[in-house]
Amino acid sequence: MNYNFKTWEEVSDYVDMHFKMPVSQWEHIVQNRNTYPAHAFSKGQLASKAWLIQQLFYIRVEKLPAVNPETLIVLGSWVGSLIEPLFQRFPHIERTYGIDIDAESIEKSEKLNQKHVQNNWKYKGVVADVNNLTLNNCEFETGGELITVKPDWIINTSCEHMDNTWFNTVDYDQLLIIQSNNSEEFEGHINTCDNLDEFNNKYPLKTEYMCGEMITPAYTRFMKIGFK
């Protein structure tokens, strides 16, 4: 599904309709507003996450009803703002690892999702360079433990922040949920895509359940979901 938002008011309306997060977590964010970067909860960021969850939920129900993922990995997880809304829609997920090269971001992600960290690591942050991981057989250290895991689902909403090394280590049976954008002016955007065709060529999937774009007044975000 594609979206073409002409104004930020339209983006806000979409977020209000589709982004679901408990009031208690919003309260935590407000009370700790000096901890979390405000742009992590901008209209554009929330819209992209709402779009991801909306499409993934539909695909899970309509296309993959027999699939029950146990383990997820979120690459470039930043402060973990996707985690709670994801669990709201997919409560059956046993464990999600948020991976980011920035230790401060991982610390903030665990603070934001503390109840899930304390719940047998339903969420656990990992400080690591995603391009040093082999995603079909991940090995990393977190919380004093050496973890080896092959995640069922791999989410990367930060493709513009990294090269494609990570993509080459994904196996054919791992569901990929990928986002990128065409905005070159933001700091750290080293691998943007000019259009949907370029996005498709960079991240080819053999089985594709959706591929689309969300146009906002500032930039266009691209997303695809499927298997290599």
List each language-model region with its residue ranges.
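Short beta-strand element of Class I
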Residues: 93-99
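Conserved SAM-binding loop of SAM-dependent methyltransferases across substrates and taxa
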Residues: 79-92
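Conserved class I S-adenosyl-L-methionine
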Residues: 67-79
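Conserved SAM/SAH-binding beta-strand->alpha-helix loop
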Residues: 101-104
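S-adenosyl-L-methionine
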Residues: 1-67, 107-151
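A short SAM/SAH-binding and catalytic strip from SAM-dependent methyltransferases
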Residues: 143, 148-165, 182
